[in-house]
Amino acid sequence: MQRSPLEKASVVSKLFFSWTRPVLKKGYRQRLELSDIYQIPSADSADNLSEKLEREWDRELASKKNPKLINALRRCFFWRFTFYGILLYLGEVTKAVQPLLLGRIIASYDPDNKTERSIAIYLGIGLCLLFIVRTLLLHPAIFGLHHIGMQMRIAMFSLIYKKTLKLSSRVLDKISIGQLVSLLSNNLNKFDEGLALAHFVWIAPLQVALLMGLIWELLQASAFCGLGFLIVLALFQAGLGRMMMKYRDQRAGKINERLVITSEMIENIQSVKAYCWEEAMEKMIENLRQTELKLTRKAAYVRYFNSSAFFFSGFFVVFLSVLPYALIKGIALRKIFTTISFCIVLRMAVTRQFPWAVQTWYDSLGAINKIQDFLQKQEYKTLEYNLTTTEVVMENVTAFWEEGFGELFEKVKQNNNNRKTSNGDDNLFFSNFSLLGTPVLKDINFKIERGQLLAVAGSTGAGKTSLLMMIMGELEPSEGKIKHSGRISFCSQFSWIMPGTIKENIIFGVSYDEYRYRSVIKACQLEEDISKFAEKDNIVLGEGGITLSGGQRARISLARAVYKDADLYLLDSPFGYLDVLTEKEIFESCVCKLMANKTRILVTSKMEHLKKADKILILHEGSSYFYGTFSELQNLRPDFSSKLMGYDSFDQFSSERRNSILTETLRRFSLEGDAPVSWTETKKQSFKQTGEFGEKRKNSILNSINSIRKFSIVQKTPLQMNGIEEDSDEPLERRLSLIPDSEQGEAILPRISVINTGPALQVRRRQSVLNMMTHSVNQGQSGHRKTTASTRKMSLAPQANLTELDIYSRRLSQETGLEISEEINEEDLKECFFDDMESIPAVTTWNTYLRYITLHKSLIFVLIWCLVIFLAEVAASLVLLWLLGNTRFQDKGNSTYSRNNSYAVIITNTSSYYVFYIYVGVADTLLALGFFRGLPLVHTLITVSKILHHKMLHSVLQAPMSTLNTLKAGGILNRFSKDIAILDDLLPLTIFDFIQLLLIVIGAIAVVSVLQPYIFLATVPVIAAFILLRAYFLQTSQQLKQLESAGRSPIFTHLVTSLKGLWTLRAFGRQPYFETLFHKALNLHTASWFLYLSTLRWFQMRIEMIFVIFFIAVTFISILTTGEGEGTVGIILTLAMNIMSTLQWAVNSSIDVDSLMRSVSRVFKFIDMPTEEGKPTKSTKAYKNGQLSKVMIIENSHVKKDDIWPSGGQMTIKDLTAKYVEGGNAILENISFSISPGQRVGLLGRTGSGKSTLLSAFLRLLNTEGEIQIDGVSWDSITLQQWRKAFGVIPQKVFIFTGTFRKNLDPYEQWSDQEIWKVADEVGLRSVIEQFPGKLDFVLVDGGCVLSHGHKQLMCLARSVLSKAKILLLDEPSAHLDPVTYQIIRRALKQAFADCTVILCEHRIEAMLECQQFLVIEENKVRQYDSIQKLLNEKSLFRQAISHSDRMKLFPHRNSSKYKSRPQIASLKEETEEEVQETRL
């Protein structure tokens, strides 16, 4: 970045913003880059501002019981805020004084007042000087207030971020990411631009008082008629605003429904294409869009009338002010024109400035209070450790994720004190200790010496991760003691990658040791992966490490933990995404050898790991089921397998699982008016808890204190759509919330009004920050294959589901054992955080405008209609003004003339009032014409928005995956949310405002030019200067806005990244470093935003200067060339002043239109995306046995018959090569093999070898070369949809969209209920569906959150059965499944797909044993394709991965009838040894 010219700029340069000229010049000539932006002044740096506010906030916390954030802000910014407010007031006062001078100038042209003619020129100079003074006062004042608002935002941004890093995990479990992002974006952005309006809360009343005093002097009591009309108008507009909000609230729900489906479609676009659901999804979304648009139109019409009321009220304000006075006393033209000028200013103050100011204060104070509440949230407490301690000891430890006894005691005591409860309520406190719920850990005891390995095992939800959190201090014990040295290293279950290089991720701020680094890289099997990158370990990874596979991310996370020199290493299921062989090697070389002298606690369920552990701790439902050595375990606990894996018997467990789902669903989904499931029923469910807990918690403390709320379904809100998308595979325990999410306008930290009154306390948690930390990085064999494309852009938009928020509190000790480097490479930051600049022009092209206008044929006619009505208005105005300016009303019989009055008086005679009748008639006509002009325009523009949405949706659904892989999911969703919202809401009204203002200015110039032709000569250069200046400014301003927008994304990305890795950050003590990173991101954004504000003010000031010159020319031309008659001078000067006040608004509107039209450009860019090849590339031939007709057309209602292709499922693959994008590197090369009908083929290979890619290639989701035939039919000879219909798919990431069970199973509505139930029976889904109210019509929301992952897999199986597919592709179907559910799926596969060809990609050994053939993929090529016997006899990857005992079990099964019953038992036993890769706290 360049050094800012502002630092050396002179006072004049700062006053006129001339220091911005270099960047304006460069932006006009070429595209601006980040390096062209100026460095921010030191006063604006996030470090300085946050330190200043933090100091005042700490002072506020220390000095008061009820600290107020606004007091801290006041001490930081009050005096500058007040100074600019006074400047603003003085600038506004000049507007009130100008009409006085105008009146004197008009009076000087009265034939009876020739004495003042000589001073008219001086009055004109004074009038012009007032305009100059106003310009010099207002622009610095507005810029100064914008600047203060920006500084306040930066300081509060930083304060909030620092607070997030200090929050206790218990608080994090009660908040959600979306609320936090909402707090930062929706609330804090109000300060940036709203602060300039804040002073009008006192300026506007003073302005009104001054103006009314001046109008009173002219018109006496009748002045209040105009004011009364304006107040009524303001109330009318407020009523319209309330009505508009009602429609918008109703519409928000419809938008939410559409965006939820759209988001699910985008996130699962690969599945949509695999299932051939493009048309079904398009129809569903368009139906929702249709309903939404009805409410959009209603809201737009109300807003249109609201806007029009302001434009057309001018006539009536003047008329109502003048008429009563004229009827009683008569009136002179001087008073009419002076009153018109006063009323222009008065109208703005009453109907715009004051209401806006009140709204600004309301919003700002609300935001400050939300932040204040947030900053007082409970903080993470650093535990006191003894560095000399060598062992790790835990004695009688019990802990709750909910508040412990101490916190609960204080809370209830405080509530009782606040409410002054009587003695009768005292037992409220004592009777509720039992309401704390089930402890997550109960009476845990163990002791491990230095250098020992403790293996922690247990079923899902047993408390394994909670145990590690306890040791780290993230979870506070309610009872017991924990003892260790405090020097901890931690590897999370879900790998966390920060933006930066691989090397930076591993070293993570610890001093660099080359030998140790190389040893760790080798032990974690990263050498081969790093060698593949051109930059080696210096390759920059984006947020979340999206360019890496799940296994690579897991190994980097493990390497980070191992590299740090610590006394205790906490490894939470670090091998989750590794293949069997890699896991085996890393466990031996890293955990057992490299870390042999270190104390290690490893969460695992692998039998091999337990055997090599010094001590074993098995947890069951939070309690210690066993603690000791492996030999003791075998002797004392022979039933340990069932506890380890979390089930006692297959049938019993599956029944309990289904019952618990039913009960939890009914309990949570009982809405108002529905009877909830009784709690006695709930007690019978699988979450084992004493009846005493269940009964007593009905009277929970907080339920007694606060009012009980009805349970509600937590649905996604529009806030979710801003960019963060979370993995949809979340368990029931975290997807449902009993605490209603806050809506916009509610307290952002909602009152905790409910403690769960059912036995399953842990089910209470919502999609909290804690939940995101433990689940959102659920990247499986890397979340979706599309995100692992090496060519995919780094995702800057937050990528987890935005729901809402509620968090934070005080300061953490700044002491850290690490030296933090303050120097941060700006290029790395840029590479990590910034997108490529959009490939659309900086300024909206004329082609975009033309394409937009011609999109709907009616729009052209509407624009022509607007022009015709405008010409009629101008003609009517000329007639009216001619009458006012050239008619003198003096009744000869009743004429009165006073030598004291220097003006002609209209006598109170009815025959003389015809001018007013004409005035009223013309005003009414113009009002009617104005409404008729705008309403069709708004209606038509919304119709255009409808067309654009339809075209874009169709284009995205038909785009090839190679194109979609280069786009971020958040970016696509922004087109459907942000850009469509702009097209619906902002663009139609902004275009209307711009056209309205433009016509007012042009009309005024036309009238002035007709009355005084010389003035027309002055308007020509002014219009030319305006057009050139606007074009000059727009080139730079739009580029600066792009840079600002690009700079905003990393702020939120960094926040989400930090929260995902918060436990890791704290374990490593890296909070100061991440605060520095956050400040750097803030400063990069500030640089662009501050420069944009400065250039905008430069432009506004130049526009005003041009029109000051124009007004000076108009004033002197009118004064020097006008002879007798005050009418002409009055009209000319009044209209010139009106031009001055209106033009700035028109200029801003023109810039807004250009800015909003960029959304249209982005939509057009999506509409113009290439489409998938839908037609066969070869001529279709007739095949034998009628397998394929000459013409096969795919329709929504195609139903496969038994004799239609494919019939057998034979596949022949020849020279298949696959790439993610055209011209990219080959992911698979020259793959050739064949599969017999009904055969089962297993895909083998290391993590990232291309197994999932091969399945995608079969479906033609990638750029492919070569040929594949199914039953003799080549993929080139039939349509794409036909080809994909041949396959049934069970993907890694299961796709459940918001809709009924029936819609999810059969979106095209082809099948009857009987057929669907039959298939549900086959796959074991009937018992699940039947337990939900409504059965097939039960609506699944939030990715099917009420279903387990296994039930979602069964849904996919049912879809495949319904599709009559002959070839089944399974991609890691057992990932994140407990063994029992996996057994159900295996059984369903055998029954429903007995005669189908099955291609299986799987890590579980026992699942692969049922395959007849195995395809081994290494280095993107086929290495082996043989039967299991041959692979085991040779030195193959499979042989290395499978243990000796497994091989001994296999051969009898394959070669001898003697052991026919063995495999089932052996397989089941192996099943029990598998790790369940999902930990719920």
UniProtKB/Swiss-Prot annotation:
Region (Disordered): 1453-1481
Binding site for ATP 2: Y1220, G1245, R1246, T1247, G1248, S1249, G1250, K1251, S1252
Cross-link (Glycyl lysine isopeptide (Lys-Gly) (interchain with G-Cter in ubiquitin)): K688
Principal subcellular localization: membrane
Residues with Phosphoserine modification: S549, S660, S670, S686, S700, S712, S737, S753, S768, S790, S795, S813, S1445, S1457
PTM statement from Swiss-Prot or TrEMBL: N-glycosylated. Phosphorylated; cAMP treatment promotes phosphorylation and activates the channel. Dephosphorylation decreases the ATPase activity (in vitro). Phosphorylation at PKA sites activates the channel. Phosphorylation at PKC sites enhances the response to phosphorylation by PKA. Phosphorylated by AMPK; this inhibits channel activity.
Glycosylation sites: N894, N900, N909
Domain statement: Binds and hydrolyzes ATP via the two cytoplasmic ABC transporter nucleotide-binding domains. The two ATP-binding domains interact with each other, forming a head-to-tail dimer. Normal ATPase activity requires interaction between the two domains. The first ABC transporter nucleotide-binding domain has no ATPase activity by itself. The PDZ-binding motif mediates interactions with GOPC and with the SLC4A7, NHERF1/EBP50 complex.
Protein name: Cystic fibrosis transmembrane conductance regulator
Annotated source species: Saimiri boliviensis boliviensis
